[in-house]
Amino acid sequence: MTAPIWMASPPEVHSALLSSGPGPGPLLVSAEGWHSLSIAYAETADELAALLAAVQAGTWDGPTAAVYVAAHTPYLAWLVQASANSAAMATRQETAATAYGTALAAMPTLAELGANHALHGVLMATNFFGINTIPIALNESDYARMWIQAATTMASYQAVSTAAVAAAPQTTPAPQIVKANAPTAASDEPNQVQEWLQWLQKIGYTDFYNNVIQPFINWLTNLPFLQAMFSGFDPWLPSLGNPLTFLSPANIAFALGYPMDIGSYVAFLSQTFAFIGADLAAAFASGNPATIAFTLMFTTVEAIGTIITDTIALVKTLLEQTLALLPAALPLLAAPLAPLTLAPASAAGGFAGLSGLAGLVGIPPSAPPVIPPVAAIAPSIPTPTPTPAPAPAPTAVTAPTPPPGPPPPPVTAPPPVTGAGIQSFGYLVGDLNSAAQARKAVGTGVRKKTPEPDSAEAPAAAAAPEEQVQPQRRRRPKIKQLGRGYEYLDLDPETGHDPTGSPQGAGTLGFAGTTHKASPGQVAGLITLPNDAFGGSPRTPMMPGTWDTDSATRVE
C-alpha cells in the first residue's frame, strides 16, 4: 500500500479534515477502558495464583491436587499475558491520541489560512505600479510555508498513528481448563471454513488471487483521487465496493463453510447496512457530487455482494440441517401411511363386515319369499269378531301343531325392512290389519295362560339344537298406528292454471263481421251476497263482464 501524497492537496484540506474530526476524546476513553481491563485480568490472575498456591500448600492431597494445578496453569499464564496486552493496547491508543493532538497543534488553522488569503487579495488590489511586490512575495511565501507545514504534519501523524496501531498486541483466545494428558474431543465438528481455505489453496486459486486479482484491487484502492475523496470518512470503501473483493478465498470459504443461522444472518446484514448508511450520510454531508456518486456506486456493490454471500451461507446451512433431520423425520412422516399398508391383509374382514348391510335390501339371496306370512294370517279373516270364550283357544294351539314345518322359515329369515309384509298393504282391505293384530293378541294371551300339553314339548326339544344354531331373531319395531296411517292421499289435485270460462259448446260469440277472440275472459272474482243464513259466503262464481247468459252472445 502506497502512502498518500500529502503535498498534492492544499493546506485547507488537511486543516479541515483534521479539525473537523471527533478529536482525541474517543481514543482516550478507549485507552481508559483497556487500562481497566488490564487491571481486571491482573486481579483475576492474582486470585487464581493464590488458590493454586493454597492447593499446593496442602488444602488438597493426592494426585488430584497436582492435576488440578496443572490444568489451571495455562489459564493463569493466559490471564497474565492478557493483562499485559491490555495495558500495551491502552498505551498505544494513548500514543495515537497524543500524535493527533500534536498534529492538530502543528496544523495551520483555517483562520490563519483565511487571513493569508484575505491579505493576499488586498495586496493584489492595491498593487499600483508594483508597490506591493515585496509584500505579495512575502505573503505567498508564508502560504507556501503553511502548505509544507500541513503536509509534513499529516505525514508525521500518519507515521506515528500507523506505528501505534501496528504495534498493538492481539490477545489469543483463552485456553480450556482440561487435564494435561486428556485427549482432544473427537466429537468436535471440523472447521469448514478452514477446510474450504485449504481446498482453495490446494487447487491453486489462493495463489492466483493473491498474485493477479489482489494487486489490481490494491492499485484501484490506492489511487490518489479515491484516497483524497474517501480519506475523510471511509478509506476502505473503494476496496469493499469492488466486486473483485467478494471473489477472495476468504469470502468464498465464508459463504461455503460458515454455519449461518437466521440470527447471524440478520446481525451481519444489519451491521453492513449501518456502515453503508454512515458512509452515505458522510458523502451527502460533504456536498461534493463526485463523492456522492462514487459512494452510491461503491455502497451498492458492497450491499449486493454482502447479501449474496450471507444468503449462500444461510441456504447451505439450512440444507445441511434438513438433510441431517430427514432420517429422523421419515418415520414420523410414514406413520400415517401405516394403516394403508396393512389394508390388503385386513380387506377380507373389512368387506365381511359390510355383509350386515344386506339386511337393508330386504331380499336376501338365500331367504325364501315373504308370501308365507300372508297365508298364515289368511285363516283368521273369516272370523272378524274375536270371542273371549275358551273354546277357540285349544284350536288355536292345536291347529298349528300338525304342520310345524312352514312357520320356521319366516322366523329364521331376516325381517324385511322395505315393507314387503302384509302390514304394508293393510290399507287395501278394510280392518284387515286390525283384525290380524287383534287375533294375534288374543292367541298370544291364550297361549300364555293355557298350559301346553306334554306332547308339544317333544317337538320343541327336538327343535332346540336348530334354534341354537340359528341367529337370534331381531325384534320387529312396534307400529303405533295402522299401516294405512302412513299413507297420504291428496284429495284435491293441485294445478297451476288459473280458472277460466270454458268455451266448449258455446260456438262463435259476438257480432257478425267481428274477429273472434281466442282466449276467454278471466274470472274477476266471486259474488258475495248480503248477510243471510249462510253468513255472506260466496254463492256464484263471477262470470266475465261481457258474457250475456240470456242471449248467448258476447260483446267484445
UniProtKB/Swiss-Prot annotation:
Residues 400-417 have a biased composition (Pro residues). Residues 8-164 are annotated as: PPE. Keywords: Host cytoplasm, Host nucleus, Secreted, Virulence. PANTHER family: GLUTAMINE-RICH PROTEIN 2. Residues 456-471 have a biased composition (Low complexity). Residues 201-256 are annotated as: SH3-like. Residues 319-340 are annotated as: Leucine zipper motif. One of its GO terms (biological process) is response to host immune response. The keyword Transferase does not apply. SUPFAM superfamilies: PE/PPE dimer-like (SSF140459). Its main location: secreted. Belongs to the mycobacterial PPE family. This is PPE family protein PPE2. It is found in: Secreted; Host cytoplasm; Host nucleus. Transmembrane segments: none annotated. Contains a conserved PPE N-terminal domain and a variable C-terminal domain. The C-terminal region includes a SH3-like region, a leucine zipper DNA-binding motif and a functional nuclear localization signal (NLS). Residues 385-418, 443-556 are annotated as: Disordered. A motif (Nuclear localization signal) lies at residues 473-481.
